[in-house]
A protein has these predicted regions:
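ATP-binding glycine-rich loop module of kinase domains
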Residues: 59-146
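C-lobe/activation-segment region of protein kinase-like
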Residues: 211-283
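Short C-terminal capping segment of an alpha-helix within the protein kinase catalytic domain
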Residues: 285-292
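Juxta-kinase regulatory segment immediately upstream of eukaryotic protein kinase catalytic domains
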Residues: 2-91
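Catalytic-loop of the protein kinase fold
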Residues: 189-212, 217
Length: 323
């Protein structure tokens, strides 16, 4: 029986987000730096496109629907002088994100402001356009609209509002459902690499769910789409830094294999979070964590190996044992 415990005891600490402005020298350019828009200025423009930014009244309604139905005292004090229709940014979000609603049907949305010429906007537009948008391998967060404001060199990515709480309040999921979630993570990686896109920030914190069995990648601030054969990235920084980048003083020789390493770490962290230590799954990650990136499998090879592995694991209906 393979030793299924070793990766959980040796996972590197998960550092905080570095943001796009700390990638390489190209990310120092304004086009790929983080946008901090004055949201009230774009309120009318977004309304014309059918989207409404959250107001004080929206926040109050959220609290009224909570378990105790009461609006917290700190919120009332903070917004004591505000009108109900004043904008109400979520203090837990960075300045480039804002919650809102699609006016046609009440769908809750997340809006992200980016530079019009940013790599992130180009990647999102590519992944969210037909035929890629409709490809079943594509597990990018559903994008409802892309609003461009050319005079300000800014764009708004309008996404469905999913949850970063990967395990629902109702409790843990079965092993079969856990495998289904992991497969979506692997499949989207294979899909991106097929189209010469490296995500470059694969981690649990960049994974969301709609609690309907769907999981999606977010945060393409560091992502790159490669047209040629030269793919090295100098001064590479990300959430999960592979060993070759540390050995090369931050240079990333193969972004695609860096994604593979980060995906292995995501899988092991997900196992720990969900309470599953499956020896077959641990074995799957071993080659993904090879120190030499050239020795790591491709995303498509990982997906194929995963699909062959799942039928060999018994009792997919079982629940995790946290004891």
């Amino acid at each position: 029986m393979p030793d299924a415990s070793w990766p959980f005891d040796n996972l590197p600490p998960s550092p905080g987000s570095t943001g796009s402005d700390s990638d390489d020298s190209l990310d120092e350019d304004e086009a790929n730096s983080r946008v901090r828009p004055h949201w009230p200025h774009y309120r009318a423009t977004l309304k014309l496109h059918g989207f409404r930014l959250d107001t004080v009244e929206d926040a109050k309604a959220f609290y009224r629907c909570s378990a105790d139905g009461r609006i917290p005292e700190f919120f009332l004090l903070k917004h004591a002088g505000d009108a109900d229709d004043d904008l109400c940014p979520d203090p837990g979000l960075p300045d480039n994100l804002f919650r809102g609603t699609r006016t046609s049907d009440g769908t809750k949305i997340m809006l992200k402001a980016v530079h019009l010429q940013s790599r992130e906007f180009a990647v999102i537009r590519f992944l969210s356009s037909p035929p890629l948008r409709d490809d079943p391998m594509n597990h990018c967060i559903p994008v409802l609209d892309l609003v461009e404001v050319e005079e300000d060199n800014i764009a708004f990515i309008i996404m469905e509002q999913w949850s970063s709480q990967l395990i629902a309040d109702e409790g843990p999921c079965t092993l079969g459902l856990f495998f289904a979630a992991l497969r979506q993570c692997i499949e989207h990686g294979a899909f991106m690499h097929k189209h010469r896109i490296a995500h470059l920030d694969i981690s649990l914190r960049n994974l969301l769910t709609d609690y309907q069995g769907h999981y999606a990648y977010i945060d393409y601030e560091l992502s790159r789409r490669f047209d040629g054969s030269y793919i090295r990235i100098p001064s590479f920084r990300t959430t999960e830094v592979p060993p070759e980048c540390e050995a090369l003083n931050g240079e990333c020789p193969d972004p695609f294999k860096a994604d593979v390493w980060a995906l292995a770490v995501l899988i092991l962290r997900a196992c720990k979070l969900a309470g599953y230590c499956v020896s077959e799954l641990v074995e799957l990650t071993r080659p993904m964590l090879k120190e030499n990136p050239a020795d790591r499998p491709t995303m498509q090879e990982i997906l194929t190996a995963f699909d062959k592995m799942v039928p060999t694991v018994g009792n997919l209906d079982r629940l995790p044992d946290f004891h």
